[in-house]
Regions:
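Gram-positive cell-envelope targeting signals
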Residues: 1-58
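Short, aromatic- and glycine-rich surface loops/edge beta-strands on solvent-exposed regions
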Residues: 146-160
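Aromatic sugar-binding surface patches on proteins
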Residues: 124-140
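Exposed beta-strand-loop-beta-strand "reactive/processing" segments of non-cytosolic proteins
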Residues: 139-143, 197-235, 244
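Extracellular ectodomain segments of secreted/surface proteins
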Residues: 48-107
Length: 246
């Protein structure tokens, strides 16, 4: 009878160990489920907010058009911009104003220069200032060049009378600034989600059309901690060509 009792005792021991193992597995599974539920509850609002937000509302500097013209000795660039005032890369968007910025590169900077042009039936003009560091003339006025395909600029440089027929660098395939930003958000979903809280986007966005032979978009995400996450996009597809963080 003793061997039988030993076998029964062994069976009971194995049974209890099996039950204990099952219980541990069940509690482990419950723990995993709870952790997953907590993670979903924490991140879901952020992801949802990132999907619903219109990040274009956080653009605090916009360059939507670039027009260029050049001769053998001169080159002219005109930008359609919207900028906040006062201008500060501090991660906070402020009220913006539309401006036309005109840059003139000349053989020398020792002559007085005046520029005149017309857009939307309105005439604009004035004396251009000279930047000794950039070695170019500059003029800014409250005007909208965002939809202009061509603009004639009349420049008086010293005793010379110059006419520049400036043409936009945009092509039929060039994305609008808003669509370009949407493309970036699609490609950088995790980054945008990490920079979004229950109040919205935690910074400001610089969005500039640029031209280096071909049109591109520069996008800068500026947060309040001073970090700048910069992207170079193909203007016709929104594809990220380069990126860096400073």
């Amino acid at each position: 009878m003793k061997p039988q009792k030993i076998r029964n005792t062994a069976k009971k021991s194995i049974f209890h160990e099996s039950n204990a193992l099952v219980i541990r597995i069940v509690w482990f599974a419950i723990g995993i489920i709870i952790l997953f539920a907590v993670a979903v509850a924490f991140f879901a609002p952020l992801v949802s907010a990132a999907k619903k937000l219109d990040y274009f509302d956080y653009v605090s500097e916009l360059r939507s058009n670039v027009l260029t013209a050049e001769t053998e000795e001169f080159s002219l660039r005109a930008f359609a911009v919207e900028k906040e005032y006062p201008y500060a890369a501090d991660g906070v968007k402020r009220e913006m104003t539309k401006r036309a910025e005109i840059y003139l590169t000349a053989p020398a900077g020792d002559e007085l220069a005046h520029v005149n042009f017309q857009v939307g039936g309105e005439k604009y003009g004035g004396e251009m200032s000279y930047d000794n560091v950039k070695e170019e003339y500059f003029f800014s006025v409250s005007a909208d060049l965002s939809k202009a395909d061509t603009v004639d600029f009349f420049v008086e440089y010293g005793k010379e009378q110059l006419t520049f027929h400036a043409v936009t660098v945009k092509k039929q395939t060039t994305l609008t600034p808003k669509i370009a930003l949407d493309k970036l958000k699609e490609n950088e979903t995790e980054l945008f989600s990490s920079l979004t809280d229950e109040h919205g986007f935690v910074g400001e966005i610089y969005l500039r059309l640029i031209c280096e032979g071909e049109p591109y978009y520069y996008v800068g995400l500026i947060t309040k901690d001073g970090k700048v996450r910069a992207f170079l996009l193909a203007a016709d597809t929104g594809k990220v060509l380069a990126k860096r963080e400073t």
